Amino acid sequence: MIQFVAFGGALLWGKLAKWMGAKQSVILSLVVWSGVVIYAYFGLYGETRVTQFFILGIFIALVMGGSQAISRSLFAQMIPKGKEAEYYSFYEISERGTSWIGPLVFGLANQMFGSLRPALLSLIFFFVIGLILLPFVKVDKAIADVKAYDANRA
């Protein structure tokens, strides 16, 4: 189920990116991710817990497929032609080099509070950091600089 919904999410976020721009779509995805975490924290109670879990899974899949695709697409626009391997290598190294931070924060929150719910809520920290930093990224300037760099090399 998740893979099929994620595929649809990628298509949906692609349309959103065309309509509102890739950077704004990534920002929106961070807001939706925060909402998903808040829903996971507050929403999974009672007799309808299984249904709520499936609803949560659908939202996770929708935003996951799209946010990853749009983020990589946005990053690709800021790479000079012929430098893709270098830039994506750096992207992967930085991703792998920091991938332990989320589980560490999650585990520490779980250990401190003795519950997975506060640990889930701790994940919002990363989305908020993205929401704070992303507006400072000058995407239009980066894309223009790449075009100028490529034109000078031709």
Language-model features, listed with the residues they occupy:
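C-terminal ends and interior cores of transmembrane alpha-helices
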Residues: 31-47
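Intracellular juxtamembrane helix-capping segments at the cytosolic ends
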Residues: 66-79
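Multi-pass alpha-helical transporter architecture, strongest
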Residues: 121-153
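Helix-to-loop junctions at the C-terminal end of transmembrane segments
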Residues: 8-23
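Hydrophobic core of transmembrane alpha-helices in multi-pass small-molecule transporters
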Residues: 49-66
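Loop-to-transmembrane helix entry/capping segments in MFS-fold secondary transporters
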Residues: 81-90
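A membrane-interface helix-boundary motif in multi-pass transporters
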Residues: 108-127
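Residue-level signature of mid-helix packing/kink "hotspots" within the transmembrane helices
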Residues: 3-11, 99-100, 104
